[in-house]
C-alpha cells in the first residue's frame, strides 16, 4: 500500500536527525518484532540516552513533538516489566515510501 501524503512533520523530524532515521530503519529491519533500548543503542552505535531521546523526546535536546513515538512511527510495548520498541504499521508504510529516496543513507548503515 502506498501513501499519497506524508506529514511534513515526519519528514522534518527525520531530516533533522540521522539518529532518528537510523533507529527507524533498524526497527524496519526487525519488523514485526521489537527490540530493547540497549540493543537499539548498540546497533546504531549511540548512547542509550540519545536513543531514548529520539524515541520519546527528552528535555530540550530532543523535542517530544518530533519523537518517533509521538509521530506514531514507533510504539513501546511493556512485556514482563521490560520495554520493547517496535515499528508501527504506519511507521512501516512511511519507511517503505522513503527507502527509495534514502538508498544511499541505507547503504551507509552497518548493522
Curated annotation (Swiss-Prot):
InterPro entries attached to this UniProt entry: ArsR-like_HTH, EarA-like, WH-like_DNA-bd_sf, WH_DNA-bd_sf
Signal peptide, first to last residue: none
Family annotation (Gene3D superfamilies): Winged helix-like DNA-binding domain superfamily/Winged helix DNA-binding domain (1.10.10.10)
Name of the protein this chain belongs to: Uncharacterized protein MJ0905
Organism of this sequence: Methanocaldococcus jannaschii (strain ATCC 43067 / DSM 2661 / JAL-1 / JCM 10045 / NBRC 100440)
Amino acid at each position: 500500500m502506498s501513501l499519497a501524503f506524508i506529514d511534513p512533520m515526519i519528514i522534518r523530524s527525520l531530516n533533522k536527525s540521522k539518529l532518528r532515521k537510523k533507529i527507524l530503519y533498524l526497527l524496519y529491519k526487525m519488523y514485526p518484532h521489537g527490540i530493547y533500548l540497549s540493543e537499539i543503542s548498540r546497533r546504531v552505535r549511540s548512547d542509550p540516552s540519545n536513543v531514548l531521546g529520539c524515541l520519546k523526546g527528552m528535555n530540550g535536546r530532543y523535542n517530544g513533538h518530533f519523537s518517533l513515538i509521538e509521530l506514531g512511527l514507533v510504539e513501546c510495548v511493556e512485556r514482563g516489566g521490560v520495554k520493547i520498541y517496535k515499528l508501527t504499521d504506519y511507521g512501516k508504510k512511511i519507511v517503505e515510501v522513503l527507502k527509495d529516496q534514502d538508498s544511499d543513507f541505507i547503504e551507509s548503515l552497518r548493522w
